[in-house]
Amino acid sequence: MSEFRLTQISDTHLARRLSKLTDNFHRVSERIDATRPDLVVNSGDLAFDGPTHRDDLEFARTLHDALPAPCRYLPGNHDIGDNPTQVGPPPSQPVTEQNQQTYRDLRRRPLAF
């Protein structure tokens, strides 16, 4: 059986207007290029402010598409908003169906393998 190599990343918080975070992602991309995993999983917060800036999600998706390995995503609170809790204040960006649909639409774009 061959070895399956997985790289997990998270909290990239990407936005075109935040060059330092983009620079960080490029360093991560260089490491992924050097190690060539079979799959990359971003476990949330791809974008800096997906609920109010769809372009943040689109920018994040473009950078992830350029990775030298297939990539899958899980949504984080910076991507679709927060769920309310019983103990804390209400979220400033609650999860909405529209935010979830925007995220799903970006995920449905074909992935290159």
Enumerate the language-model features and the residues they cover.
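N-terminal active-site segment of His-dependent metallophosphoesterases
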Residues: M1-E58, L63
